[in-house]
């Protein structure tokens, strides 16, 4: 017990007194790796499955909508408990941190089990709803069935990872994700081509990799390498605790939930043209997501710093954390956009050697590059509100990119501009979200971070 207290005090001192640039870099570099590895799960699947057929490649995009639903609840519960934990540790309330972490873990596993049962019972209509055509449907069903079975483990892993990040142990969080990601890349070609399992092999590789990540993350807690202790006795029986977790995590649930909705709408809009169009937007979205995942990774380093320092009353360090993260994220976005804009055809060809897929995907990538430089700012304004407990504004901002702004655009632009309208809907929503975020950031700094 004394070692635990000393560890907690040392961590609190680090979060409150280490220079902000050095602190955020130390936290965000592991989370960057974690985010990239997380995207790598799907990107590796897309790459190897694309070698089977264009319809199989499109199926990955359809099931991505389903995975976004699972991630919505896993990330939402994880972010909710993570924000409470970082503020609790900043205020020296370790018992509350233990209670929230333990409760969130059990809650996430239960939600994942419910999603698994509901998804398996409605699999075929669900796949059609998410954008499957008759030719895509068999591939989508094979892939989704195995992913659904892994849902409880996936949701619980997101909580374990967020608890470690919330206490400032981003490196420990990274270990599990990195090992799982590397395993996924190795298992994909083995199961798909050597064992001739096809697209089901890609799903099995992802599920097993998620299980390995879960076991590695759980080992950190079982062997006392974390500040927060997960114990069955600490699981809360108070609805108020679960309500708080959901309230703080609700912006993330909205953001990821709308991501699922937007992906389904995009798939359906593209399916009106061809399977090649669905495959093209699937691949271009994976590339776009690689850059966005880096922005989110930096933000996951920023959030515990903001939570600790705001909880301890250090407003100047909270402001500095926001601006440093925004600058760093913008530089990453500009570099990513420049690289993609230079080689759009080569990137598309790397995934699928289909001239029609390359033509459509190239256009989508160039539209995305045009708005990448403004993504970091709007993302961190949203995360600032969320991690400091301003739930209503955070939910509104989280709903803009993939919901309030995107849904009207994806319903309107394809009718006006055809396939080009499908490709430009998400970039247009990203730019409008940036404009909406500006007054929110100005207000917050004037009224909550002054002094």
Which residues does each PLM region occupy?
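Helix-terminus/linker motif at the lipid-water interface of multi-pass membrane proteins
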Residues: 36, 40-58, 127-134, 190-197, ...
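Short runs within selected transmembrane alpha-helices of multi-pass transporters and secretion channels
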Residues: 78, 147-165, 173-181, 202-217, ...
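Small-residue-rich hydrophobic transmembrane alpha-helices
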Residues: 57-117, 154-173, 267, 280-344, ...
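Short alpha-helical transmembrane segments in multi-pass integral membrane proteins
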Residues: 1-31, 85-152, 194-250, 306-371, ...
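Transmembrane helical elements of multi-pass membrane transporters/channels
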Residues: 26-45, 146, 180, 209-213, ...
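Hydrophobic transmembrane alpha-helices of multi-pass small-molecule transporters
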Residues: 69-72, 184-189, 214-218, 290-293, ...
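Interfacial/gating helices of multi-pass transporter permease domains
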Residues: 48-68, 135-139, 199-204, 241-248, ...
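Hydrophobic/aromatic residues in alpha-helical transmembrane segments
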Residues: 29, 45, 81-82, 122-123, ...
